Amino acid sequence: MGSIDAAVLGSEKKSNPGKATILALGKAFPHQLVMQEYLVDGYFKTTKCDDPELKQKLTRLCKTTTVKTRYVVMSEEILKKYPELAIEGGSTVTQRLDICNDAVTEMAVEASRACIKNWGRSISDITHVVYVSSSEARLPGGDLYLAKGLGLSPDTHRVLLYFVGCSGGVAGLRVAKDIAENNPGSRVLLATSETTIIGFKPPSVDRPYDLVGVALFGDGAGAMIIGSDPDPICEKPLFELHTAIQNFLPETEKTIDGRLTEQGINFKLSRELPQIIEDNVENFCKKLIGKAGLAHKNYNQMFWAVHPGGPAILNRIEKRLNLSPEKLSPSRRALMDYGNASSNSIVYVLEYMLEESKKVRNMNEEENEWGLILAFGPGVTFEGIIARNLDV
């Protein structure tokens, strides 16, 4: 894409004709709220594990994640019905998918309804659906069950993104942006939904990396409505979406590795991931900002909606880009309140971004109109979108 029109760079914050905008946000969570301080004892009791070294390691990890609360689908009722999920080595993929397929649909429908309510228009005005999940596997896919659950028209066009991991929310937003800008009058529902049950396992000395996921990841769903040329009577755009790019790093595909096995998904997260992101994030951001015609902008003159993959990743990004501490506050808050919720997290970050931008406006401080929406996932893949905050 070319540089941003000079008129758009002025002080008047109206959406640019033909540009995709985020018109509403919504979220949903399962009923089980987990306090991080009680997680270790509960997890080891549930899985009947008494290994003191593993318990000490998980205790240390829980203290370093900065997570305070998370929501999870897993419950005593589920384990009572499927006790094999907490036993090492059993073939449980069928049971897991039965639980996950239903759970992600339920959460996606709830988040979408909340989003549509915030949007204020009729559900019949939705023309396209982009559905993202790394927590289910079935034919037909969750996109159809979401459309069915919402009562969408059979004519609704659907796109399905499976197993995109933590970059899925921004990848879905990029796809929704392209749909909205190439189909005048369209309104795209982007829904993301994730649950960790697909990879829930008892602790094992053979899989020490599993404990990182136990300490960090959470469940939930997110939703957005995306469309261009908002109706000034009934729509209030939140963010305008400009340049969007994707980049994968060659020879890093084993850094975030997931395999669907008889025991569910086995994840391996390399310790090198934070360093890999730190080493490559600046060049990626320069490329993104340059394509948008904003190379003159200082990083601290922009907002940063970054997927909260973990505190180490956020700390390294902050250090490498020399960002002021408040720049990643929305990401850190999302991590603290919801954990790393994979593709959903960017919705939660954007909600906090809007909340904090309103506080800045009320305090008569400098507003950051332009910014970046970033996420990192398997590949290692970088996703980035230049956005304009229209709500400040």
From Swiss-Prot:
<dbReference type="InterPro" id="IPR016039">
    <property type="entry name" value="Thiolase-like"/>
</dbReference>
<dbReference type="InterPro" id="IPR011141">
    <property type="entry name" value="Polyketide_synthase_type-III"/>
</dbReference>
<dbReference type="GO" id="GO:0080110">
    <property type="term" value="P:sporopollenin biosynthetic process"/>
</dbReference>
<feature type="binding site">
    <location>
        <begin position="57"/>
        <end position="64"/>
    </location>
    <ligand>
        <name>CoA</name>
    </ligand>
</feature>
<keyword id="KW-0808">Transferase</keyword>
<dbReference type="GO" id="GO:0090439">
    <property type="term" value="F:tetraketide alpha-pyrone synthase activity"/>
</dbReference>
<feature type="binding site">
    <location>
        <begin position="309"/>
        <end position="312"/>
    </location>
    <ligand>
        <name>CoA</name>
    </ligand>
</feature>
<dbReference type="InterPro" id="IPR001099">
    <property type="entry name" value="Chalcone/stilbene_synt_N"/>
</dbReference>
<dbReference type="GO" id="GO:0005783">
    <property type="term" value="C:endoplasmic reticulum"/>
</dbReference>
<comment type="similarity">
    <text>Belongs to the thiolase-like superfamily. Chalcone/stilbene synthases family.</text>
</comment>
<dbReference type="GO" id="GO:0010584">
    <property type="term" value="P:pollen exine formation"/>
</dbReference>
<feature type="binding site">
    <location>
        <begin position="218"/>
        <end position="219"/>
    </location>
    <ligand>
        <name>substrate</name>
    </ligand>
</feature>
<dbReference type="GO" id="GO:0009813">
    <property type="term" value="P:flavonoid biosynthetic process"/>
</dbReference>
<feature type="binding site">
    <location>
        <position position="269"/>
    </location>
    <ligand>
        <name>CoA</name>
    </ligand>
</feature>
<keyword id="KW-0284">Flavonoid biosynthesis</keyword>
<comment type="subunit">
    <text>Homodimer. Interacts with 4CLL1/ACOS5 and TKPR1.</text>
</comment>
<protein>
    <recommendedName>
        <fullName>Type III polyketide synthase B</fullName>
        <ecNumber>2.3.1.-</ecNumber>
    </recommendedName>
</protein>
<dbReference type="GO" id="GO:0030639">
    <property type="term" value="P:polyketide biosynthetic process"/>
</dbReference>
<comment type="function">
    <text>Plant type III polyketide synthases (PKSs) that catalyzes the condensation of malonyl-CoA units with various CoA ester starter molecules to generate a diverse array of natural products including long-chain alkyl alpha-pyrones. Accepts up to C(20) chain-length fatty acyl CoAs as starter substrates, and carries out sequential condensations with malonyl-CoA to produce triketide and tetraketide alpha-pyrones, potential sporopollenin precursors. Favorite substrates for are midchain- and v-hydroxylated fatty acyl-CoAs (e.g. 12-hydroxyoctadecanoyl-CoA and 16-hydroxyhexadecanoyl-CoA).</text>
</comment>
<comment type="pathway">
    <text>Secondary metabolite biosynthesis; flavonoid biosynthesis.</text>
</comment>
<dbReference type="Pfam" id="PF02797">
    <property type="entry name" value="Chal_sti_synt_C"/>
</dbReference>
<feature type="active site" description="Nucleophile">
    <location>
        <position position="166"/>
    </location>
</feature>
<dbReference type="InterPro" id="IPR012328">
    <property type="entry name" value="Chalcone/stilbene_synt_C"/>
</dbReference>
<dbReference type="Pfam" id="PF00195">
    <property type="entry name" value="Chal_sti_synt_N"/>
</dbReference>
<keyword id="KW-0217">Developmental protein</keyword>
<feature type="binding site">
    <location>
        <position position="312"/>
    </location>
    <ligand>
        <name>CoA</name>
    </ligand>
</feature>
<keyword id="KW-0012">Acyltransferase</keyword>
<keyword id="KW-0256">Endoplasmic reticulum</keyword>
